[in-house]
């Protein structure tokens, strides 16, 4: 059984429209957003409304069931993006959600999926395990002021555009950018992402180079106050689209994780570390806060397997 851990009011207009993820009365387990806090899920047993419990296939490993929640975010982002088969995609952030956004884009027929992260190991993993087609390691640069920060974002966008895709051509401009970091520089680069754009390009050059009508999906949650080049988006109708949690995604997620196609991403590889018993919860959270473990292995998705009750 996989729990959809948000419990909406089921009475408001948003719930009636199927957009219960933005229900004002939502109570979300393990979240401190609302008060009084709802019970968390790190318990041996828990009572949860049957409506939000989803039965897993008998042959599905529990680790895959644990991916349904982040996969739900990816599916919700995909649906809001309007991505269609044959389009090109850029994903900023190669954590669990970013990898799953890339995976969904590939499964849904994206022509090229580029994944970008500051961690070279993560983007290499993404390509090796078939989550993405092309990897890009984002340089660790920070601007000392707004102008320098925007210049770095344009430079990053230009470098992405010069990458070589599976057909041996330049990636160029992309149709949809899934921004899964919440980092200001990545949101800026997502707006700018273009083909053959030099780091000293003018605002006019940018408006001519970036895909008109493209979308930047705001999946990651970072600093709530950010400086963005809105003119670069507005004058070419590049949409900035918010993504908050998920709604009506678990059944499709189960279908995706149940697929056996050889070209699909290796979803099991996403679960890199396992801990047994609630006594190890602190160790599990400490591991989840790392990018690599003591042996130098990547840390992506960490799961806690509770001991069965007697």
Q: Model-derived features: where do they sit?
A:
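ADP-ribose/adenylate-binding Rossmann-like module
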Residues: 178-179, 192-225, 240-243
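A glycine-rich, Thr/Ser-enriched phosphate-binding loop motif common to dinucleotide/cofactor-binding enzymes
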Residues: 36-42, 58-80, 92-100
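Glycine-rich phosphate/adenylate-binding loop and adjacent beta-alpha elements
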Residues: 1-53
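C-terminal hydrophobic helical "lid"/dimerization subdomain
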Residues: 188-191, 198-207, 247, 251-310
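Adenosine-nucleotide cofactor-binding segment
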Residues: 91-94, 106-192
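Residues in the short beta-alpha loop(s) of Rossmann-like NAD(P)-binding domains
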Residues: 118-119, 222, 246
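Rossmann-fold dehydrogenase core element
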Residues: 211-219, 228-269
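Glycine-rich helix-loop-beta junction characteristic of Rossmann-like nucleotide cofactor-binding loops
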Residues: 79-84, 107, 169-170, 208
């Amino acid at each position: 059984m996989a729990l959809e851990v948000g419990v909406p009011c089921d009475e408001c207009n948003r719930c009636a429209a199927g957009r219960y993820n933005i229900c004002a009365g939502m109570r979300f387990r393990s979240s401190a957003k609302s008060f009084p806090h709802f019970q968390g899920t790190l318990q041996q047993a828990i009572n949860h409304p049957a409506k939000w419990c989803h039965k897993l296939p008998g042959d599905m490993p529990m680790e895959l069931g644990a991916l349904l929640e982040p996969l739900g975010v990816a599916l919700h982002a995909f649906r809001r993006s309007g991505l269609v088969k044959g389009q090109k995609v850029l994903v900023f952030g190669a954590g669990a959600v970013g990898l799953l956004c890339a995976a969904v884009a590939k499964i849904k027929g994206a022509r090229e999926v580029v994944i970008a992260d500051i961690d070279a190991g993560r983007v290499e993993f993404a390509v090796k395990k078939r989550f993405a087609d092309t990897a890009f390691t984002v340089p660790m640069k920070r601007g000392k002021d707004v102008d320098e920060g925007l210049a770095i974002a344009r430079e990053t966008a230009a470098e992405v555009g010069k990458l070589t895709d599976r057909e041996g051509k330049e990636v160029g401009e992309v149709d949809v950018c899934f921004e899964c970091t919440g980092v200001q520089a990545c949101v800026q680069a997502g707006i700018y992402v273009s083909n053959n754009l030099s780091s000293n390009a003018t605002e006019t050059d940018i408006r001519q180079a970036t895909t008109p009508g493209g979308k930047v999906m705001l999946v990651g949650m970072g600093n709530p106050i950010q400086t963005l080049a809105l003119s670069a988006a507005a004058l070419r109708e590049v949409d900035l689209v918010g993504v908050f949690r998920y709604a009506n995604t678990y059944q499709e997620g189960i279908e995706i994780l149940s697929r056996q196609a050889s070209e699909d991403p290796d979803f099991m590889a996403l679960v890199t570390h396992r801990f047994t018993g609630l006594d190890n919860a602190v160790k599990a959270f400490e591991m989840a806060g790392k990018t690599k473990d003591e042996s130098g292995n990547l840390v992506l998705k960490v799961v806690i397997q509770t001991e069965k009750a007697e």
